[in-house]
Amino acid sequence: MQLPASAFTAVDWDAIVPTLHPGETGQAEWRTLNVGDMRLRRVDYSPGYLADHWCDRGHVIFVLEGELTSELKDGRTTTLTAGMSYHVSDFGDPAHRSSTSVGAKLFIVD
């Protein structure tokens, strides 16, 4: 990963105003910080959230709280709990989408 030039920066994620993103069911709240071409996010998924799209973008995703299920278009599923992560490159595998039955808080770099 090539990180863009950036000064040392502490971030208070609770101070960033969230944007709401409805899913097919439930919703996601994104708190976003853009640093050059890198996007940092703290994302909160409501219980019952299902993404409204399939994604081919690369990510590093770390589960802070709750439980996240990632489904790949080829039928594979992976469930992550707090303290677990996954990473995938742009177009690195079949497209994926996220869901959660209980809600989840994530830290995402893409």
Regions inferred by a protein language model and the residue ranges of each:
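Conserved short histidine dyad/triad with adjacent acidic residue
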Residues: 36-55, 89-92
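Short, conserved beta-strand element in jelly-roll/cupin
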Residues: 45, 54-70
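A short hydrophobic beta-strand segment most commonly corresponding to one strand
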Residues: 86-91, 101-110
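Short acidic-glycine-tyrosine-enriched beta hairpin
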Residues: 74-91
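Short beta-strand segments in beta-sandwich/barrel cores
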Residues: 50, 67-71, 85
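A short, N-terminal "cap"/entry segment at the start of jelly-roll beta-barrel domains
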Residues: 1-42
